[in-house]
Amino acid sequence: MTEMDRISISLPSKLLREFDEIIAERGYASRSEAIRDAIRDYIIKHKWIHSLEGERAGSISVIYNHHASDVMEKITEIQHNYTDIIVATLHLHLDHDHCLETILVRGDAKRIRELTDRLTALKGVKQVKLSVMVPGGQIPE
């Protein structure tokens, strides 16, 4: 049998309620099993992103609370350090509190990964989604 460690985490009530609804909907036997699956998915995504190499093109979508302490300024400051890979940006106001920033990128996968990691670590950022592809000339016929 696999050795298990017991941990304790703090979550916002609304987030836990939504997670519990998904647990019930998917028929999990326990909250712990659902959390293990979520952690496995997170690890797989992390490994995939960190295995990318070579020239890539894609987008980084960032949802953030624009009321959070200077998050917009920090996002802009970070972007200025990656002008070698940023092709364009699009800013969308989602509601009174939240914005979506989509950053189109093209360049070395390592630089794209660095930019994604820096944006993910910012306080006030709610979600970051990276979508990458190989440039057209590298797609097999």
Swiss-Prot record:
Q: How is the cofactor bound?
A: Binds 1 nickel ion per subunit.
Q: Which InterPro entries match?
A: Acetolactate_synth/TF_NikR_C, ACT-like_dom_sf, Arc_rbn_hlx_hlx, CopG, CopG/NikR_regulator, Ni_resp_reg_NikR, Ribbon_hlx_hlx, TF_NikR_Ni-bd_C
Q: Does the keyword DNA-binding apply?
A: yes
List GO molecular-function terms, semicolon-separated: DNA binding; DNA-binding transcription factor activity; nickel cation binding
Cofactor(s) needed by this chain: Ni(2+)
Which Pfam families does the record match to this protein? NikR_C (PF08753), RHH_1 (PF01402)
The entry describes its oligomerization and partners as:
Homotetramer.
Can you say what this protein is called?
A: Putative nickel-responsive regulator
Organism of this sequence: Methanocaldococcus jannaschii (strain ATCC 43067 / DSM 2661 / JAL-1 / JCM 10045 / NBRC 100440) (Methanococcus jannaschii)
